[in-house]
Amino acid sequence: MMQDLRLILIIVGAIAIIALLVHGFWTSRKERSSMFRDRPLKRMKSKRDDDYYDEDVEDDEGVGEVRVHRVNHAPANAQEHEAARPSPQHQYQPPYASAQPRQPVQQPPEAQVPPQHAPRPAQPVQQPAYQPQPEQPLQQPVSPQVAPAPQPVHSAPQPAQQAFQPAEPVAAPQPEPVAEPAPVMDKPKRKEAVIIMNVAAHHGSELNGELLLNSIQQAGFIFGDMNIYHRHLSPDGSGPALFSLANMVKPGTFDPEMKDFTTPGVTIFMQVPSYGDELQNFKLMLQSAQHIADEVGGVVLDDQRRMMTPQKLREYQDIIREVKDANA
């Protein structure tokens, strides 16, 4: 925007300068032409003054009829001079007079020569020369042209100053204080977690109880505390429990004597930390779940009861590592 405004100011200034040059050139030519046109008139005036001077000399030296002859012929001579002096005298005199304030270098004394040699009887002859001055309005359109020319030159810098005023605070912007980033608090590591996975029947069906119990026992689970099945360190049930298996239906318990029952699925869970290597225990847990699902015709699901995916398995492993690091 500043560049556009600067370009506009340059164009306006150039136009104003060109207008002033054209106006000055036009005025100079007009004044020069008026001076050339006034020269024949001045010669006529000087000739007329010489005639008047000769008549005055004759009047002073002559007597009688010569004086009467001068009085009788003076009006005739005045009429001849008035006829010889055309009206352009009034048309040229105003432009020369109006040009004086603009061109003080011009020599106006030439216009003042006739009054010095004009005698007293010739004064009534010069009065009608200055009386018809209604033709001066022709010079009126010249004077208003000079006034509006400098106006755009003085008015042009004003918007430039206004345009640069708002740029002062922008020139030296103060650096804003940069807010230091708040220290990121490390998420506290979990010291314990529970890994859960499910073995469920397909949608709209349930698992057979007798087939389910046989597959659970084949996977190494033994019925024990809380009426649920546990997988111990040793397949014969000795050693600490690594993970457990419960019924998906509340209260989650089993009755080994019941053969005729059905369930939508079972839940296998492992508490971390646990005995031994938790990652190896997790692999054994996943193998047991996959064995039971294959035997009963079910599927392995995650803790949200969604299809188990490799991404979810890696998430479980990351949780186990986090707990191990927190308890190291």
Curated annotation (Swiss-Prot):
Bias (Low complexity): 99-115, 123-171
UniProt keyword Isomerase present: no
Cytoplasmic compartment residues: 28-328
UniProt membrane topology term: Single-pass type I membrane protein
Main location: membrane
Ranges per topology, Periplasmic: 1-6
Protein localization: Cell inner membrane
Chain intervals for the UniProt region annotation (Disordered): 43-64, 77-186
Origin superkingdom: Bacteria
Biological processes per GO annotation: division septum assembly; FtsZ-dependent cytokinesis
Keyword Cell membrane set for record: yes
Residue spans of biased composition, Acidic residues class: 51-63
Membrane-crossing residue ranges in chain numbering: 7-27
GO cellular component, one term: plasma membrane
Record-linked Pfam families: ZipA_C
InterPro entries: Cell_div_ZipA (IPR011919), ZipA_FtsZ-bd_C (IPR007449), ZipA_FtsZ-bd_C_sf (IPR036765)
Alphabetical keyword list: Cell cycle, Cell division, Cell inner membrane, Cell membrane, Membrane, Transmembrane, Transmembrane helix
Function: Essential cell division protein that stabilizes the FtsZ protofilaments by cross-linking them and that serves as a cytoplasmic membrane anchor for the Z ring. Also required for the recruitment to the septal ring of downstream cell division proteins.
HAMAP family attached to this UniProt entry: ZipA
UniProt-listed NCBIfam families: septum_zipA
Subunit (UniProt): Interacts with FtsZ via their C-terminal domains.
Family to which this protein belongs: Belongs to the ZipA family.
PANTHER family membership: CELL DIVISION PROTEIN ZIPA (PTHR38685:SF1)
Protein name (Swiss-Prot/TrEMBL): Cell division protein ZipA
Origin species: Shigella boydii serotype 18 (strain CDC 3083-94 / BS512)
Taxonomic lineage of the native organism: Bacteria, Pseudomonadati, Pseudomonadota, Gammaproteobacteria, Enterobacterales
